[in-house]
Each structure stands twice: as C-alpha cells, then as structure tokens.
C-alpha cells in the first residue's frame, strides 16, 4: 500500500517544509519539523539536505537545528519588490502622503538592515530621497528599531549582539544596554521614533504592519524637524495605524 507521503508531490512537500521553518520563527530541530510537516524522519532529513544545498535552508553550526536560508530570504524580498504586487501598496502610501504631506515608506527586515520596499515622496523640495531597495541600519532608524523590537526574543538578542551600533549623529544610540531599554519601550508602545538619530535634522515615526503571526513590516513617515517636529509626527499615529491595517490586508489576503 502506498505511503501517504508518496502521494504528495515532492515539490509540495518541500514547500510545506519551508513554510514550517518560517512559521517556527526560530531554528527548529528535526523532531520538531517531523511533527509539523508529518513526514518520516528519513524523508525529511533527505529533503532538508537538498534544500540546504540549494541555499533555501541553513543548519546551525554545531547543532541539528534548521532555519530559513539566505536564498529563501532573497526570494521573499524579490517577491515584495516585484512591480506587479506594488500597485495597491503604492496607492495606500500615496493616500497617506496626501493626508500627512510628508514622505511615507513601507519597509521590511533584511538580515541586519532595513530595506525600503515601497516609498512615496513628498512634494516638498527639501527631503531625503531613497529608492526602493535601499538599505538603512537597524539601531538608529524608526523602522529598524521597531522591527528589531518585535522579533522573537532569541532572534532579537542574537541579531542585536551582531549590530555594530555605529554613530551617525549626536543622538544615535551606540550603547547596547540603552538600545535594549529602547526596544523594550517600543514593544510596549507598538511604535518607534527616530529623533535625529540617523540624519541630523530628520525625524521619523514608524508603526508595525501585521503579518499572519506577527509584525512583518513597518510603515513610517519622516520629514525635516523644521517642518515636522517629533510631537507633530507623533500626532499622526492614528493615521499611520489605519494605513498599516490597510497595508496588512494586502499582505495577508
């Protein structure tokens, strides 16, 4: 009698393994994955080996735990940056810019940096211009601190320990203990600010965009402090959160 797993195409089994690894939100052991995808250990072990060879899965050094690999992360970024999926997100950002009058952007975590996925610029001539696909640091940007703060604890601590905490302005947080306190406040408040920490004279406020299980992206507004002091930027939190809810619906269907 054919085994159940033999009736499922290998490609679909591989997809289910990748989905399980992403859903785990931390490196998973073979036994954990076996119960998640309901495949025999020998079958799953062989499949993980093939996925590891392809760069879609990585194995922790000195451990028997698996995590999503760099190639899988790159595929996810490519999907998000694909023009065919950006029209609705762009429309949400355009409406937000029309309401606030300042540049708004949609960002995601990309390794130890933030990547700008979508962005709509203000009409003001004085502005900071960044193109989609640009990267900025985590520890001194509103989106970066927000995404870092909302990661699972083990992932957040591991990633934070790797950050160089370079100084960009007099306001940049360069002390690990102080950054940890800032991230704790962000988790409680569910928003983050950049008060001239990345660029002198520039402020930013970011709110989370919910994925199926946790925040997977950030929506932010930024402007010169001479035009939008931080207090005024914070007054737009309700507007940003409404837009973030609309953005979430485009990601989760």
Annotate each PLM feature:
Residues 20, 88-99, 185, 189, ...:
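Amphipathic alpha-helical regulatory segments at dimerization interfaces
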Residues 1-82, 86-87, 245-253:
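N-terminal helix-turn-helix
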Residues 174-243:
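Extended hydrophobic
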Residues 7-11, 30, 65, 69, ...:
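Short, structured helix-loop boundary elements
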Residues 168-169, 200:
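Intrinsically disordered, low-complexity polar/acidic regions
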Residues 57-59, 106-107, 209:
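A structural signal for short hydrophobic beta-strand segments in well-ordered beta-sheet cores
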Residues 63, 67-163:
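Amphipathic alpha-helical effector-binding/dimerization core
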């Amino acid at each position: 009698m054919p085994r159940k797993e033999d009736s499922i195409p290998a490609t679909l089994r591989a997809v289910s393994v990748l989905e399980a690894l992403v859903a785990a939100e931390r490196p998973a052991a073979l036994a954990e994955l076996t119960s998640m995808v309901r495949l025999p250990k020998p079958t799953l072990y062989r499949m993980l080996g093939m996925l590891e060879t392809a760069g879609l899965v990585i194995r922790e050094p000195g451990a028997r735990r698996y995590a999503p690999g760099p190639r899988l992360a790159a595929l996810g970024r490519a999907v998000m940056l694909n023009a065919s999926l950006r029209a609705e997100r762009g429309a949400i950002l355009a409406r937000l810019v029309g309401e606030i009058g300042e540049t708004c952007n949609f960002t995601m975590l990309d390794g130890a940096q933030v990547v700008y996925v979508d962005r709509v610029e203000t009409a003001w001539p004085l502005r900071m211009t960044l193109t989609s696909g640009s990267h900025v640091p985590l520890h001194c940007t509103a989106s970066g601190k927000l995404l870092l703060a909302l990661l699972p604890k083990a992932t957040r601590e591991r990633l934070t320990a790797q950050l160089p905490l370079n100084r960009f302005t007099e306001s940049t947080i360069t002390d690990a203990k102080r950054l940890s306190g800032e991230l704790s406040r962000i988790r409680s408040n569910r928003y983050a600010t950049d008060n001239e920490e990345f660029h002198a004279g520039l402020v930013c406020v970011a709110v989370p965009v919910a994925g199926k299980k946790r925040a997977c992206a950030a929506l932010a507004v930024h402007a010169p402090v001479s035009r939008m002091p931080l207090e005024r930027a914070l007054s737009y939190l309700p507007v940003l959160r409404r837009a973030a809810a609309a953005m979430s619906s485009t990601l989760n269907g």
